[in-house]
Amino acid sequence: MADSIIQSPELGDVTGYLRERIRTVPDWPMPGVMFRDITPLLQNPKTLRVLIDVFVHRYMDAQLDLVAGIDARGFILGAIVAYELNLGFVPIRKKGKLPFQTVAEEYELEYGSATVEIHADACKSGDRVLLVDDLIATGGTMMAGLKLLERLGATVVEGAAIVDLPELGGSKLLQDGGLPLFTVCKFEGH
């Protein structure tokens, strides 16, 4: 799957510009994994602005009501995008981190399972929501977020992430599950 090329008069290939600034950490958190570290994008004010602008320009006319972000790096991207679009932000958290009544969704990991939660009053029926995370690997976390939002009556307009690892099957799982997906760049491998 080739990256879709996002062009800018000032930067040229924005996709390539951002992709080149994502650090690859071999064998972390375990041998054989090539960890795609987005923190260099966040640390530099220019790359952070370019990254946020990509999402803002994509969604500024999407008639959204909310942006939901997945714990933890999806909070960073999602909250900034929500602010720039003048929308509210909904955190989707790991189990036990939200103080009010919650709705939960369990999902499978490579070795076991995990649970994410959302406040029961986080959105209402008919809300149009953008669902954001930093990276799509197996797709389990974003699929769980999708199910939570839909259970509360929201329509998830699109899932969005900085990085897609298509060989792990997550983007296919999400698209096959009916979720349109936008990612800034793709990397081969794990």
UniProtKB/Swiss-Prot annotation:
Record keyword Glycosyltransferase present: yes
Entry's localization field: Cytoplasm
One of the protein's GO biological processes: purine ribonucleoside salvage
EC number: 2.4.2.7
Superkingdom of origin organism: Bacteria
InterPro entries noted in UniProt: Ade_phspho_trans, Adenine_PRTase, PRibTrfase_dom, PRTase-like
Swiss-Prot/TrEMBL keywords: Cytoplasm, Glycosyltransferase, Purine salvage, Transferase
Entry-linked Pfam families: Pribosyltran
Top EC group: transferase
Pathways per UniProt: Purine metabolism; AMP biosynthesis via salvage pathway; AMP from adenine: step 1/1
GO MF annotations, alphabetized: adenine phosphoribosyltransferase activity
Keyword Metal-binding listed: no
Cellular component, GO annotation: cytoplasm
Reaction equations catalysed: AMP + diphosphate = 5-phospho-alpha-D-ribose 1-diphosphate + adenine
Family: Belongs to the purine/pyrimidine phosphoribosyltransferase family.
HAMAP family: Aden_phosphoribosyltr
Function: Catalyzes a salvage reaction resulting in the formation of AMP, that is energically less costly than de novo synthesis.
Oligomeric and partner information: Homodimer.
Protein name (record): Adenine phosphoribosyltransferase
Gene that this sequence comes from: apt
